[in-house]
Design a protein with these regions (language model features):
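C-terminal alpha-helical cap of glycosyltransferases
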Residues: 358-376
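An amphipathic, basic-hydrophobic alpha-helix
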Residues: 66-98
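Active-site-proximal region of nucleotide-activated glycan assembly enzymes
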Residues: 34, 40, 55, 115-181
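A short, well-ordered alpha-helix in the C-terminal region of glycosyltransferases
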Residues: 344-358
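Conserved nucleotide-sugar phosphate-binding/catalytic loop shared by glycosyltransferases and other
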Residues: 3-8, 27-79, 167-169, 233-235, ...
Length: 376
């Protein structure tokens, strides 16, 4: 079986593709799996896919710039034509039995050409609000899988052939297999350590980073607290300089990195998580049952991260801190309250797992893809 995975831009599109690929490889060790992403250096696929050991092909495509009247958007029609040609060459050479797109601008040309050539083509949309690539491809794709039931309504219903289904978000195997005690032992954490895990997205988030620098400096005064923060590659050098100018810079319990590559271990070991409220982050928190302080990105379409965060808040499964309040010290205040209340952390962890976890998502996605191949 030959499978071509495509999706990218941010880790939120790449990681679902990696999780689906890992599930297929687990069931079919001899499966040949390759990826297609954009040629942009900032595309996280160019980092994460080779690390996972898969061949990676690239096409010359990028997302639409904001504002819409930006002169750089004049190049998009040319790039759309060029990338479709490049995708066609990749498909012709690889000859896939199945193409799976996980959203982001990078998946459009490959999925579009796969559909045109009659290759079974499936899409997965992790967010409640579907992105432009999925919106453009939904009517032609053979299968559209979603994480939220409401996404099907936003896509116009189940489609003419009932080809839209809810399956949940796929998770990397580590999120399902690693226990808290095993992860903490692996990371050298004791029972007395209170581990705070913090990240603002694969590319970084300036205001979140600034707030965590202040938080880390404060937490140096709490002896049993350990913090790991991923600042993102784009903002890392600036934050490293700020970090080193505070008490956090000389405190071994406060750690700063650009990106977390062993997220399943870190998430499993955490007592408290600080993160954005993207769909994949919420799914990871739910599957591992973690208390979380969510800082929704205000820069996404229709405030979908705020909606994700408030869904958790309304169930008592999370705390929301809006980005515009960060300069007021709201993050430090909320974290301090949760550190002081293990009971509240425990309740939040139980509720997010009970209300939002979808532990069989990988199996449902795999079964759906195999049914698609057999039906064609």
């Amino acid at each position: 079986m030959r499978v071509l995975m495509t999706g990218g831009g941010t880790a939120g599109h790449v990681n679902p593709a990696l999780a689906i690929a890992a599930t297929i490889r687990e069931k079919h060790p001899d499966a040949e799996i390759a990826f297609v992403a954009s040629a942009l250096t900032r595309d996280k696929a160019n980092d994460l896919v080779p690390r996972a050991g898969y061949p990676l092909h690239t096409v010359h495509i990028r997302g639409m710039a904001r504002p819409l009247w930006s002169p750089s958007n004049l190049k998009l029609p040319f790039l759309m034509v060029k990338s479709r040609g490049e995708a066609g060459c990749i498909i012709d050479e690889f000859r896939p039995d199945l193409i799976v797109g996980t959203g982001g601008f990078a998946c459009w040309p490959t999925c579009r050409m796969g559909i045109k050539l009659g290759i079974p083509t499936a899409l997965h949309e992790s967010n409640a609000l579907p992105g432009q690539a999925v919106l453009k491809l939904k009517d032609k794709a053979d299968l559209v899988m979603v994480n939220f039931s409401e996404t099907i309504d936003r896509l116009g219903g189940t489609g003419k052939h009932g080809h839209m289904i809810r399956v949940g978000n796929p998770m990397m195997p580590g999120f399902r297999e690693i226990s808290r005690s095993e992860a903490r032992k692996r990371l050298g954490l004791t029972d007395d350590d209170l581990f705070v895990l913090s990240f603002g997205g694969s590319l970084g988030a300036e205001y979140v980073n600034d707030a965590v620098v202040k938080l880390a400096a404060e937490l140096t005064n709490t002896p049993n607290v350990t913090l790991l923060h991923a600042a993102g590659k784009r903002d890392y050098d600036r934050i490293r300089a700020d970090w080193d100018r505070t008490a956090a810079g000389t405190c071994g319990r406060m750690q700063l990195v650009d990106y977390i590559y062993d997220m399943p271990d870190r998430m499993a070991a955490a007592d408290l998580v600080i993160s954005r409220a993207g769909a994949m982050s919420v799914s990871e928190l739910a599957l591992t049952g973690k208390a979380a302080v969510l800082i929704p990105s205000p820069y996404v379409a229709e405030q979908h991260q705020l909606k994700n965060a408030m869904a958790l808040v309304n169930e008592g499964a999370g705390v929301c801190v809006e980005e515009h309040t960060l300069p007021e010290g709201t993050l430090t205040k909320q974290v301090a309250e949760l550190i002081a209340s293990p009971e509240k952390r425990a309740v939040m962890g139980e509720r997010i797992r009970e209300k939002f976890a979808c532990p069989d998502a990988n199996e449902r996605i795999y079964d759906s893809l195999m049914s698609l191949i057999k039906s064609k």
